[in-house]
Amino acid sequence: MKYTSSFLALLLSVLLGFSGSYGQGPFFKEIENLKEYFNASNPDVAKGGPLFSEILKNWKEESDKKIIQSQIVSFYFKLFENLKDNQVIQRSMDIIKQDMFQKFLNGSSEKLEDFKKLIQIPVDDLQIQRKAINELIKVMNDLSPKSNLRKRKRSQNLFRGRRASM
């Protein structure tokens, strides 16, 4: 009986150890499928260095990383859209897209639809260019006031803290 419980405890710890590596998501198997399909483990893939890893190292703060990650996710969504008619890898792409959707957009279908709209906007269309330039002031204003307001609040809090400690 003692051996049985010891064996079961060992088996459970082995299973938990494996579930730690496989429990990270169903997308690992699907990524391996895509790697095999595209022959992405071939040594010639390393020529010229990585596409995204080195860039991500330069972005340390979480809010800054989100900016660059949105561009990377956009790239993958475009890549998957370009390959949507390939039935051999369709299932793998669907599972990976779903996992990206959950991780990056917190499962919000509204955010996903907005994200898809943005990545599908053609930049070589004159009418689109004109609309984008027309909205540029609003976009720039949306980018700046929040950060200025945060800086102002931070400096006010610092000033109050110094005055209180004097």
Curated annotation (Swiss-Prot):
Which of this chain's residues carry glycans?
N39, N106
InterPro entries, per database record: 4_helix_cytokine-like_core, Interferon_gamma
The subcellular location is:
Secreted
Main subcellular localization, coarse class? secreted
Query: What cellular component GO annotations does this protein have?
Result: extracellular space
Q: In which tissues is it expressed?
A: Released primarily from activated T lymphocytes.
The cross-references to SUPFAM superfamilies, in alphabetical order and at most eight, read: 4-helical cytokines
Top-level taxon: Eukaryota
Oligomeric and partner information: Homodimer. Interacts with IFNGR1 (via extracellular domain); this interaction promotes IFNGR1 dimerization.
Q: What does this protein do?
A: Type II interferon produced by immune cells such as T-cells and NK cells that plays crucial roles in antimicrobial, antiviral, and antitumor responses by activating effector immune cells and enhancing antigen presentation. Primarily signals through the JAK-STAT pathway after interaction with its receptor IFNGR1 to affect gene regulation. Upon IFNG binding, IFNGR1 intracellular domain opens out to allow association of downstream signaling components JAK2, JAK1 and STAT1, leading to STAT1 activation, nuclear translocation and transcription of IFNG-regulated genes.
Designated name of the protein = Interferon gamma
Q: Which organism is it from?
A: Capra hircus
- Its gene name is IFNG
